[in-house]
Amino acid sequence: MHNIIEQISSNISGKQKKKKQIILSHTSRDVEEYLSMVKNRMNGGFKRIPHFVISKDGTIIQKLRTESYSDYFDEINVNRNSIIISLENLGWLEKVPVKNYLTNWIGNIYNGTPYEKKWRDYFLWDPYTDRQMKSLAGLCKDLVDEHKIEKKCVGHNTTIKDVEKMGGIVSRSNFDKRFTDISPAFNFEKLTNYIQDEQFV
């Protein structure tokens, strides 16, 4: 297993060893704010805790043991059967009128160069970093081997009926068209190639 910083939460909903899916999501805020929110259970009790968080610099933080689960999704069977990985990323971005910067839906400011692609009524996206991609690929490779999860990835751009019954690596956006994570800025082809490459570690 790759180097992982453990910050294990005691706020779990249950345990189940057998896992079918890895679900990718994003934080919608910088990693420090997100981890603080998870730790302090803000917003009336923050129960949507992922198993792992991967920062922009590729650092992996583990929040739950893989056999545990939280109320990340409203459907309990999805929570039981999945390992959830949240990537530090602001998601979709929009230009602030008059001012020369971009923000996401909660008002976090983005100062870099956005990824541009029209999808679900949005045009600008916070890019994922190469360090994130490599850390995610290494982690996913370990997890699919350990939990006998299928080595296949479903892209971001489609909502799939009964996606919870599928095996492999999926996105939060595959469950409901309201969700935009993982976004078009994420390269699923590269992730798949890393995971299937026996030389990649």
What spans do the regions from the language model cover?
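N-terminal catalytic cores of peptidoglycan-degrading enzymes
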Residues: 1-81
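Basic/polar, cationic surfaces and motifs that engage anionic cell-wall
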Residues: 15-16, 95-201
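Structural preference for beta-strand elements that scaffold enzyme active sites
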Residues: 21, 82-84, 168-170
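Short catalytic/ligand-binding loop motif for oxyanion handling, primarily in non-cytosolic enzymes
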Residues: 32, 62, 92-95, 177-179
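Flexible, solvent-exposed short loops/turns enriched in glycine
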Residues: 76-79, 92-93, 104-106
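Short loop/turn segments at strand-loop or loop-helix junctions that form parts
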Residues: 85-90
